[in-house]
């Protein structure tokens, strides 16, 4: 029984798994008469990579990472969804990519997303949805079963782990209600970490740690950045939102509501590597980092979306299931806004507001906050040590002494947290 085998080993370290071996075991099980499990060799992985105006220096390594996975390339359908507003240069890059990877995958599909379509905002969601609709048409034309096609969405700088598609395919096959699951890898922002400025490196590593910790708490996990879902489920719910800035986190709530609470996100504990923020000048980089974090913070718009549904008469998700999720969503965005300045300055607020305060709280609060900061410093030291092990190999053009800056950069943590996280 593949379900029993899965449950017996789910607590083991998944990074040590040879998922090709597990898929081979599932193939043998699927040959048993009466076994209703999907046959692994009938599963296809479709990868939708969206692009705006990125150059080949960004796009080619990302496609190569998909090519180099351990999953058979003849069962990978690659879709490049690129924006019409990216101009002629993007059009040329798309054609060059298709020519370069001709014959590598089952198919390499180019989908140009038109500009100014009715009912769409300018963003990733409309591009993904437009590409997803074309993918569904392609699958119908090729007479493939949509229930056996797993769709992974990627940004143009995303480079997946070699085991990612095998891992997703295995998790997909062993779940009886597989259409009601999404599969979430760990986003690690280290592709270009050696070239990034110190403040951006601090933010990139901090976000990477947050994603690692999130993967350890599957009951709280939501869609973020790159993720995978079955094509049949995506088509049933009209793919991704075309009206929200943050389409990934919003996809969790859309899926939860559409499937009436029968929806979960499965952690895929292997990385998909992404870029840290780099722009032209230092000022442009600082601004671009702010814009990226602001975009993520637009997930706060889900508070109104979820709250409205929670208290709606049309709600089909059990109240006791949805209410705790709503409160965690609300708490997360509020905490994000105030935590850094409160920890830094909150202990002194009572005395600053009332210099004559003699109460025990006003007197002891600075000491309490000081203890918290001391414990936080210990955690920061651990973070520094672990982050050094996460670094990719130093490029030849980067000097050896720059590794020292990977430690010194953390003195910027308080400033970065206050400026960018509040």
Name the predicted role of every residue range.
Residues 26-59, 121, 314-340, 406-420:
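Loop-to-transmembrane boundary segments
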Residues 1, 328-422:
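Membrane-embedded multi-pass helical conduit in multi-pass membrane proteins
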Residues 2-301:
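Internal catalytic domains of large membrane-associated glycosyltransferases
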Residues 256-339, 346-360, 417:
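C-terminal catalytic/acceptor-binding lobe
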